[in-house]
Amino acid sequence: MSNRGRDYLVLSQCAHVCQRGVRFGPWMYVRTHHDGYHLFPDEMLFDIERDPHEQDDLASDRLDACGEAVRRLAEWHDSMMKSMDCDVDPLRTVITEGGPTYARGFPRRYCERLEATGRGWAIPELKRRHPREFE
């Protein structure tokens, strides 16, 4: 890597969800590791230049861009892990500790809220995705 830096930007978030994304060219790719009970898909891809509010997920249509994003994330991840004293990715640590900070202990109350607001249809999928949190 030169002193110029990379031609892409990697972002991680572990407060409300556990996601890592990469911004390159017109694309914003987001990989969801824990959806914070929001039923996000595992992968999302947005054309930020045409869709700055990230409303139109193109992941299923642009597998080429998703593949490039995954390659860039892997390159970044390998570089970061080599530079750390710890051999565990901090995002993995958050997940093994119970998930995103503000989602911990939240699923039962959230299900009550979903029922009260007419969105109870989402509860079976939440329980399927997060069985340990509902034990």
Predicted region positions:
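Long, internal low-complexity/basic segments
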Residues: 60-135
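Intrinsically disordered, low-complexity polar regions and short flexible loop motifs
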Residues: 51
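Carboxylate-dense, calcium-coordinating segments in secreted/extracellular and ER-lumen proteins
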Residues: 54-58
